[in-house]
Design a protein with these regions (language model features):
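Short S/T/G/P-rich N-terminal loop/turn motif that feeds into the first structured element of a domain
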Residues: 1-79, 93-111
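C-terminal structural segments of small proteins and small subunits
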Residues: 84-91
Length: 111
């Protein structure tokens, strides 16, 4: 079982799609390399196909072992300093204000 932290976002500002994604990958891979996250995927709505008209174009899925690992990742990012923050800022400043977040878990839980 895993916890999936999902983000739906649109990109705005002066950055190419490739740079936006590559910068995001650098940040997320840093968390994977530090064992703060299991894996991630960055996806984009294909040809604008979606049933919800205002659903953001980008979907980022981050997989964690459990809530404790999510907490470790947030604690790692929260100081907003150093190389990791530079990587975070390199794409996050181009995320539009309509960002949405959700936390999912396999069901049923084993609790």
């Amino acid at each position: 079982m895993a916890d999936l932290y999902t983000i739906w976002a649109n990109k705005e500002g002066d950055i190419s799609d490739i740079d936006f994604v590559n910068n995001m990958k650098s940040f997320l891979q840093h968390l994977v390399d530090e064992d703060k996250m299991i894996s991630y995927r960055i996806t984009r709505c294909k040809m604008g196909f979606r049933s919800v008209a205002d659903m953001p174009e980008w979907l980022i899925i981050m997989e964690f072992k459990n809530m404790a690992q999510i907490d470790e990742a947030f604690r790692r990012v929260a100081p907003l300093e150093g190389e990791l923050e530079d990587k975070h800022r390199s794409f996050n400043q181009f995320v539009a204000g309509d960002i949405q977040h959700a936390l999912w878990r396999d069901y049923p839980d084993t609790f």
